[in-house]
Design a protein with these regions (language model features):
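Short intrinsically disordered, low-complexity coil segments enriched in acidic
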Residues: 1, 57-61
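Condensing-enzyme catalytic core mediating Claisen C-C bond formation in acyl metabolism
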Residues: 2-32, 41
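Active-site loop-to-helix "anion-binding N-cap" substructures in soluble metabolic enzymes
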Residues: 25, 29-31, 51, 79, ...
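Short, well-ordered amphipathic alpha-helical segments that serve as non-catalytic structural scaffolds
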Residues: 32-47, 73-77
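Short acidic capping loops at alpha-helix termini that bridge into adjacent secondary structure
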Residues: 49-57, 85-88
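Conserved catalytic cysteine-centered active-site region
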Residues: 62-101
Length: 101
């Protein structure tokens, strides 16, 4: 008999963005686009549809990076990854430990 759990908090997969250097190959990639790629890959690895996500927790350093997103990069990334608009997104800045939280 299969057990289905429909309440609780689940981490089904995680992915990270690549490291880069200032002015390097990623300098023209918008932060929310890069975050959206990582989110889509996590959905794929966890075999989860974006529509099933209730809340996005996105770890990111330098959230106010001078881009048009400003501090909204996690929210914009969630939307670009296909998470429904009515679902919240939380940006976490713990410097090097951002992704671990």
């Amino acid at each position: 008999m299969a057990v289905v759990i429909n309440k609780g908090i689940f981490i089904v997969a995680a992915k990270r963005t690549p490291f880069g250097k200032m002015g390097g190959a990623l300098k023209d990639v918008h932060p929310s686009d890069l975050l959206a790629v990582a989110a889509k890959e996590a959905f794929k690895a966890g075999n989860v549809a974006p529509s099933l996500i209730d809340t996005s927790n996105i770890g990111q350093v330098y959230t106010l990076s001078g881009t048009s997103d400003g501090g909204l990069s996690p929210r914009h990334a969630a939307l670009k990854a296909g998470i429904p608009q009515e679902k919240p997104a939380l940006g976490i800045n713990r410097l090097c430990g951002s992704g671990f939280q």
